[in-house]
Amino acid sequence: MIVPILLVLVLVLVLVLVLTHTRKKPEYKCFLLTLETSAYRREKFLDHYDGSVPLEIIYGTDTRKLENAKKYQKIIEPNYYREALKLHYNANKTRPDITYFNLGAIGCYMGHMDFYRRCFDQNLKYAVIFEDNVVIKDTRVYREIQDVINKKGDDFEMCFFHCLSRYPDKESAEKSGLERVKWISSTKCYLIHVDNMKKYYKHFFPIDNHVDMKHEDIIARGARVYYKDLRHCLHIDRTHNSTIGHS
């Protein structure tokens, strides 16, 4: 009789340990970048988000409105601002090359810069940002993000979890599912080591590119930027028009 009781106690103890381990709070804080007017996208994100993981909402500025875009004119390279104005006034105008952007992209850029400032002000060590058309389809995403922190510790600046395109650094290949990159496109979801990024923040200015492709500049200055494919956990909802006005 004693043996079965002991077995039950052991099983209960193991179960408690497993549950305790799986419920361990992540070492990072999450942020959601959205617009006040993007209620549907925001609510869809929140419907799929685990509320036990700390989340702060960043409401960006809608710079598709010229009066809002003008606030940032002084931190944008003049030629890029002029081209953005041309795109605003002429629907048939094309961009000189892929680094040029429309007015709406300015607000997106500054929303990501607001993310950095909040992380610095709150003395966070690690932080993750989601854009509001991300849909979390598998709760493993939180563990996958924590795994990057567990593996890299202080030895990285950023890790992207979604991309449209990238240029791998084949000389720094890893077997852990992490891929170091020299260039990457898309800022839908990424992790930063806050302290390590402090020295790179100034290099985001002046604005002369889209925020995602601007990371090429900090990579050239030594930032260790990685990519981890989390498409099995994340889905990008493209059923609605771009909130920055891109086609």
Model-derived regions: residue spans:
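An acidic/histidine-cluster motif and surrounding catalytic segment
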Residues: 5-130, 134-247
